[in-house]
């Protein structure tokens, strides 16, 4: 049961981030960004912490679990088109994040989370905004540009909590062994 605890908490964290972001994306701050741009990058933090601490296999479990729970709540809390766009973009981008993270994980501690989050955020942004808003009168292209700029800034800022959380997990006496399954 102890081995499932990180996955359980990862899934809960991911589901909360997805559901909150899917509601927040409907509330623009200005013509360039919505509130969702400030909350969603935390999903990449959750994925990267799980990947670094517990392995790619467990990170994927968190992504799949977070996807299922997040989509259910998103359908309930947000517009169906937002939920569909979110699910598609989330699943694609998070799995790419895990893949890229593992390819560059032997570099310095900050490169894997920054590079993987930057690339997968671009994919997430294009998929989400084109599915959610294409054909609407909303300024979704400028929202997408602003969203990606925020995601890049957040990828950099979230390196601090990434390092702190990894240090805490690494220093715990009862650490769950990292799954090295690709």
Name these PLM-found stretches.
Residues 18-26, 73-77, 128, 132, ...:
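Structural signal for membrane-spanning alpha-helices in multi-pass inner-membrane proteins
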Residues 15-18, 66-70, 121:
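Residue-level recognition of pore/gate-forming positions within transmembrane alpha-helices
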Residues 1-54:
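Hydrophobic transmembrane alpha-helices
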Residues 6-11, 57-68, 108-115:
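Cytoplasmic-side transmembrane-helix entry/capping segments in multi-pass membrane proteins
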Residues 83-182:
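Membrane-embedded alpha-helical hairpins and interfacial helices in multi-pass inner-membrane proteins
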Residues 47-77:
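A glycine-rich, hydrophobic loop/mini-helix early in the fold
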Residues 23-35, 70-89:
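Interfacial aromatic-anchored transmembrane helix boundaries in multi-pass membrane proteins
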Residues 2-3, 51-59, 103-108:
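Membrane-interface helix-boundary motifs at transmembrane edges
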């Amino acid at each position: 049961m102890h081995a499932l605890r990180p996955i359980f908490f990862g899934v809960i964290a991911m589901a909360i981030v997805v559901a909150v972001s899917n509601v927040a994306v409907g509330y623009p701050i200005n013509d360039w960004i919505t509130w969702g741009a400030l909350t969603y990058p935390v999903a990449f933090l959750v994925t990267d912490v799980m990947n670094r601490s517990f392995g790619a296999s467990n990170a994927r479990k968190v992504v799949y679990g977070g996807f299922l729970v997040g989509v259910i709540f998103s359908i309930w809390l947000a517009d169906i088109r937002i939920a569909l766009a979110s699910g598609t973009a989330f699943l694609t981008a998070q799995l790419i994040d895990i893949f890229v993270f593992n390819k560059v994980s032997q570099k310095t501690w900050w490169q894997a989370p920054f590079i993987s989050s930057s690339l997968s955020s671009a994919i997430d942004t294009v998929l989400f905004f084109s599915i959610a808003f294409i054909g609407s009168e909303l300024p979704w292209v400028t929202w997408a540009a602003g969203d990606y700029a925020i995601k890049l800034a957040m990828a950099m800022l979230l390196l601090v909590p990434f390092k702190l959380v990894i240090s805490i997990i690494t220093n715990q006496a009862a650490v769950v062994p990292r799954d090295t399954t690709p």
